[in-house]
Amino acid sequence: MLGGGDEGHIVNTASMAGLTTAPFMSIYDVTKHAVVALSESMYKELQVTGAPIGVSVLCPGLIVTNIMRSARNRPEDLAEAGKAGPMAQTFGQALSDRLAGGYPPSEVADQVVAGIREGRFYVVPAQPEVKSAIGIRAQDLIELKNPTLRRG
């Protein structure tokens, strides 16, 4: 992209988990935070160099997907390694139930296209709980407080 000199745009998909954290989601949260950090650094690097390439990071909350059925893709020899304890199973079921009320993927795609056209870095679908969670985490950081455990 840089060598060609043409305009372009990169969209990296993270998650609300790239901007917040939740119990029983540590590995997922870490990977999504990494995507956000990579995207922010890439955005700044491209700005400094004056490259005609934009960057956006998609941080959706709940989207109607099969993410909670991903174990179906686990190799048989690793099936036991993927077994969750009772508390994690309860959390997983609650998340599955909430996902059913999420955004349809087509609506998220429309928001990504709008974000690119508007030159927005953060593409965060307008779910009130997403913005609230981001605000709570930011306030905890500003006040150097221990992380707030969100309920619900």
Whereabouts are the PLM-identified features?
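Short-chain dehydrogenase/reductase
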Residues: 39-40, 109
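Rossmann-fold scaffold of SDR-type NAD(P)-dependent oxidoreductases
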Residues: 12
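Active-site-adjacent segment of SDR/Rossmann-fold oxidoreductases
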Residues: 2-4, 20, 41-53
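Active-site helix of classical SDR
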Residues: 31
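SDR active-site lid
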Residues: 45-123
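Residue(s) in the substrate-gating loop at a strand-loop-helix junction
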Residues: 15
